[in-house]
C-alpha cells in the first residue's frame, strides 16, 4: 500500500481573520462572556470585524436538501416543500444586511408524511411538530443577542412547528413567512391524489403508464402544502 507523506502534514494553525473586535471597556468588563466570545465566532465565520455589535436578527427555516445555485439537486430533501425555502431566507438575510443589521440563520428540517405513508415513519409525523417547536425555541434562546426572529416554513408539520415556536416569543418581534405552494401539473394529478396510485393500479383503475407519467409530474414545482 502506497502512502502519501502529505497525509501526515496536518494543519493545526492559521492566521485568523484580520482586524479588531469593536470592544470597549464597559462591554468587555460587564457583558456576558458569551456575548464577547460570540463576536469572535462571528469574525471567524467571515463577518467584517468592524461591522460587529450591530442589531442582530435570527432567521429560522425548515430548509432541507442541498440545492446548487443553478437549481440542480446536490442532495435531495424530504419533500419539495422545504427544497427552496433557503432562497427566501437568503433574500431576508440580504435585506437585513442592507438595512445595517446582522442576520443569523438556523435550520430545523421537516419530514413528509406522504413519504412515510404506509411505513413506521408515519409514527413520527405528528410528533415532529412539538419536537421541532421545542428545538426552534431552543435555537432562539441560544442566540441571546437577537432582536427579533423571522421564520420561513411550509407544509402541515414544519409551518405549525414554526408558528408554535414564534408564538412563544412574548418579548420578541416575530414574523412568519409561508414558503409558498407547489404548482399543479398542467395534465395529471395533484400531489395529494397521486399518493393513491398504487392502490388504484392494484384495482385496475389506472394503467402502469398513467401511474408512471402522472407520478413524475405531480409535484410541478417546489413549494409546500
PLM segments and residue spans:
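Metallocofactor- and cofactor-centric catalytic cores in central/energy metabolism, strongly enriched
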Residues: 1-225
Amino acid at each position: 500500500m502506497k502512502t502519501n507523506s502529505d497525509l501526515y502534514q496536518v494543519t493545526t494553525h492559521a492566521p485568523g481573520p484580520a482586524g479588531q473586535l469593536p470592544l470597549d471597556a464597559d462591554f468587555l468588563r460587564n457583558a456576558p462572556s458569551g456575548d464577547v466570545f460570540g463576536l469572535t465566532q462571528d469574525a471567524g465565520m467571515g463577518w467584517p470585524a468592524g461591522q460587529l455589535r450591530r442589531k442582530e436578527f435570527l432567521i429560522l427555516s425548515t430548509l432541507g436538501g442541498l440545492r446548487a445555485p443553478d437549481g440542480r439537486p446536490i442532495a435531495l430533501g424530504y419533500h419539495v416543500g422545504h427544497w427552496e425555502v433557503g432562497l427566501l431566507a437568503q433574500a431576508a438575510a440580504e435585506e437585513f444586511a442592507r438595512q445595517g443589521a446582522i442576520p443569523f440563520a438556523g435550520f430545523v428540517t421537516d419530514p413528509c408524511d406522504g413519504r412515510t405513508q404506509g411505513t413506521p415513519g408515519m409514527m413520527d409525523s405528528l410528533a415532529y411538530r412539538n419536537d421541532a417547536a421545542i428545538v426552534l425555541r431552543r435555537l432562539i434562546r441560544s442566540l441571546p443577542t437577537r432582536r427579533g426572529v423571522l421564520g420561513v416554513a411550509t407544509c402541515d408539520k414544519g409551518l405549525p412547528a414554526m408558528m408554535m415556536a414564534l408564538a412563544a416569543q412574548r418579548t420578541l418581534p416575530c414574523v412568519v413567512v409561508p414558503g409558498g405552494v407547489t404548482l399543479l401539473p398542467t395534465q395529471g394529478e395533484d400531489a395529494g391524489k397521486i399518493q393513491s396510485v398504487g392502490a388504484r393500479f392494484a384495482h385496475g383503475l389506472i394503467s402502469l403508464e398513467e401511474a408512471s407519467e402522472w407520478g413524475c409530474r405531480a409535484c410541478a414545482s417546489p413549494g409546500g402544502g
